[in-house]
């Protein structure tokens, strides 16, 4: 909005010239989202606390230390969604189709998460909306997004780029749509499973969003994409602004979500953030890189899948003391802060490996 207004009304000023640069607008997006989080955070937390008498329901079979979290309000993801969307609307090019498609998915997944959080709070249990119902809604939204991308792109690509290999890509044909839906839904739920400790998911999300800010910028730039031998996708550079806003809003949220958390992001935040990262990876054709950069989310999800299947196959035996994996280490006696910080370190390593794929091929 601000970007479009400046370009349409102020042509020959230094300010207008600065707004031509995606890097400048991205930096400004981080500052704005951080500022909004710091200003609105206390107000939103107090408002959520007044509406939620018991806060987010805490599982009775979880680590004993989690019982100290009773009464902590949830739905803090509203803060992240609002600040990210506002900064994007202010600073991104609103004539860009990818911005609107991504915002549509971001908000839609946030609504699903909000409904789930609302059900948990009102029923005072941790079950919320049925898993199959959530998956169905996520699948429908992801399908709509994929159809929009197919329709709006003049020559939609169904290629799956393989990182670390030069000019290696797989043509999935129309099966790519099914794959893209799997990526978006899978990413949304993987982040959701990881969000189980104070601050645990927030920083890895910021690392992943920051990585895709760089990827979006490079893929959307003809010179850089040619130099790095990446698939050039025009207009994806504007997603850098959105990704930068996600980084700032996550860091701002961490201020209140660090142990001991004053608020949880809830499914409102985790489903929307995971979903938007999946959407951006599909648009930029870096779906496999998302699995690398977000390797922590993949590991957490894999631990749940392995636990469930092993439990059923052995009729009651478990691989881990508790799944997802972060609870396993808590049950082993690790302090929550130690689990969180060590998982952050792992997340940094995955992000560096994923980003190295841009050059190593």
From Swiss-Prot:
<comment type="pathway">
    <text>Cell wall biogenesis; peptidoglycan biosynthesis.</text>
</comment>
<dbReference type="GO" id="GO:0005886">
    <property type="term" value="C:plasma membrane"/>
</dbReference>
<feature type="transmembrane region" description="Helical">
    <location>
        <begin position="168"/>
        <end position="188"/>
    </location>
</feature>
<dbReference type="InterPro" id="IPR003524">
    <property type="entry name" value="PNAcMuramoyl-5peptid_Trfase"/>
</dbReference>
<dbReference type="GO" id="GO:0008360">
    <property type="term" value="P:regulation of cell shape"/>
</dbReference>
<dbReference type="GO" id="GO:0051992">
    <property type="term" value="F:UDP-N-acetylmuramoyl-L-alanyl-D-glutamyl-meso-2,6-diaminopimelyl-D-alanyl-D-alanine:undecaprenyl-phosphate transferase activity"/>
</dbReference>
<keyword id="KW-0472">Membrane</keyword>
<feature type="transmembrane region" description="Helical">
    <location>
        <begin position="133"/>
        <end position="153"/>
    </location>
</feature>
<keyword id="KW-1003">Cell membrane</keyword>
<keyword id="KW-1133">Transmembrane helix</keyword>
<comment type="similarity">
    <text>Belongs to the glycosyltransferase 4 family. MraY subfamily.</text>
</comment>
<keyword id="KW-0460">Magnesium</keyword>
<feature type="transmembrane region" description="Helical">
    <location>
        <begin position="28"/>
        <end position="48"/>
    </location>
</feature>
<feature type="transmembrane region" description="Helical">
    <location>
        <begin position="288"/>
        <end position="308"/>
    </location>
</feature>
<keyword id="KW-0961">Cell wall biogenesis/degradation</keyword>
<dbReference type="GO" id="GO:0008963">
    <property type="term" value="F:phospho-N-acetylmuramoyl-pentapeptide-transferase activity"/>
</dbReference>
<feature type="transmembrane region" description="Helical">
    <location>
        <begin position="74"/>
        <end position="94"/>
    </location>
</feature>
<keyword id="KW-0131">Cell cycle</keyword>
<dbReference type="GO" id="GO:0046872">
    <property type="term" value="F:metal ion binding"/>
</dbReference>
<keyword id="KW-0132">Cell division</keyword>
<dbReference type="InterPro" id="IPR000715">
    <property type="entry name" value="Glycosyl_transferase_4"/>
</dbReference>
<feature type="transmembrane region" description="Helical">
    <location>
        <begin position="263"/>
        <end position="283"/>
    </location>
</feature>
<keyword id="KW-0812">Transmembrane</keyword>
<dbReference type="Pfam" id="PF00953">
    <property type="entry name" value="Glycos_transf_4"/>
</dbReference>
<dbReference type="GO" id="GO:0051301">
    <property type="term" value="P:cell division"/>
</dbReference>
<dbReference type="GO" id="GO:0009252">
    <property type="term" value="P:peptidoglycan biosynthetic process"/>
</dbReference>
<feature type="transmembrane region" description="Helical">
    <location>
        <begin position="99"/>
        <end position="119"/>
    </location>
</feature>
<dbReference type="InterPro" id="IPR018480">
    <property type="entry name" value="PNAcMuramoyl-5peptid_Trfase_CS"/>
</dbReference>
<feature type="transmembrane region" description="Helical">
    <location>
        <begin position="338"/>
        <end position="358"/>
    </location>
</feature>
<keyword id="KW-0479">Metal-binding</keyword>
<feature type="transmembrane region" description="Helical">
    <location>
        <begin position="203"/>
        <end position="223"/>
    </location>
</feature>
<keyword id="KW-0808">Transferase</keyword>
<keyword id="KW-0133">Cell shape</keyword>
<comment type="function">
    <text>Catalyzes the initial step of the lipid cycle reactions in the biosynthesis of the cell wall peptidoglycan: transfers peptidoglycan precursor phospho-MurNAc-pentapeptide from UDP-MurNAc-pentapeptide onto the lipid carrier undecaprenyl phosphate, yielding undecaprenyl-pyrophosphoryl-MurNAc-pentapeptide, known as lipid I.</text>
</comment>
<keyword id="KW-0997">Cell inner membrane</keyword>
<protein>
    <recommendedName>
        <fullName>Phospho-N-acetylmuramoyl-pentapeptide-transferase</fullName>
        <ecNumber>2.7.8.13</ecNumber>
    </recommendedName>
</protein>
<feature type="transmembrane region" description="Helical">
    <location>
        <begin position="236"/>
        <end position="256"/>
    </location>
</feature>
<dbReference type="GO" id="GO:0071555">
    <property type="term" value="P:cell wall organization"/>
</dbReference>
<keyword id="KW-0573">Peptidoglycan synthesis</keyword>
């Amino acid at each position: 909005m601000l970007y479009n207004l400046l370009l349409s009304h102020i042509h020959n000023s230094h300010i207008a010239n600065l707004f031509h640069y995606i890097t400048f607008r991205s930096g400004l997006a981080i500052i704005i989202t951080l500022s909004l989080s710091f200003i609105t955070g206390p107000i939103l937390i107090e408002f959520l606390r007044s509406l939620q008498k018991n806060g987010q329901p805490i599982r009775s079979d979880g680590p004993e230390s989690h019982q100290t979290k009773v009464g902590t309000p949830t739905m803090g993801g509203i803060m992240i969604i609002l600040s990210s969307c506002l900064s994007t609307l202010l600073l991104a090019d609103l004539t860009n189709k990818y911005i609107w498609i991504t915002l549509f998915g971001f908000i839609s997944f946030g609504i699903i998460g909000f409904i789930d959080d609302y059900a948990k709070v009102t029923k005072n249990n941790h079950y919320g909306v049925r898993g199959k119902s959530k998956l169905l809604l996520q699948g429908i939204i992801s399908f709509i997004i994929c159809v929009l991308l197919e329709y709006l792109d003049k020559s939609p690509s169904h290629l799956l780029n393989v990182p670390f290999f030069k000019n290696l890509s797989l043509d999935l044909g129309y099966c790519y749509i099914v794959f893209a839906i799997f990526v978006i839904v899978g990413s949304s739920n993987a982040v959701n499973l990881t969000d189980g400790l104070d601050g645990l998911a927030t920083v890895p999300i910021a690392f992943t969003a920051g990585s895709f800010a760089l990827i979006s910028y490079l893929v959307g730039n003809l010179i850089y994409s040619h130099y790095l031998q990446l698939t050039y996708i025009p207009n994806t550079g504007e997603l850098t602004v959105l990704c930068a806003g996600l980084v700032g809003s996550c860091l701002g949220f961490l201020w209140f979500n660090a142990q001991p958390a004053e608020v949880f992001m809830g499914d409102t935040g985790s489903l929307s953030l995971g979903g938007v990262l999946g959407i951006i990876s599909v648009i930029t054709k870096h779906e496999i890189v998302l699995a690398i950069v977000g390797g922590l989310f993949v590991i957490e999800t894999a631990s749940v899948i392995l636990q469930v299947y092993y439990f059923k196959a052995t009729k009651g035996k478990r691989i881990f003391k508790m799944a997802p994996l972060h609870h396993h280490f808590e049950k082993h006696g690790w302090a929550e802060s130690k689990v969180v910080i060590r998982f952050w370190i792992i997340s940094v390593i995955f992000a560096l490996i994923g980003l190295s794929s841009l050059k190593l091929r």
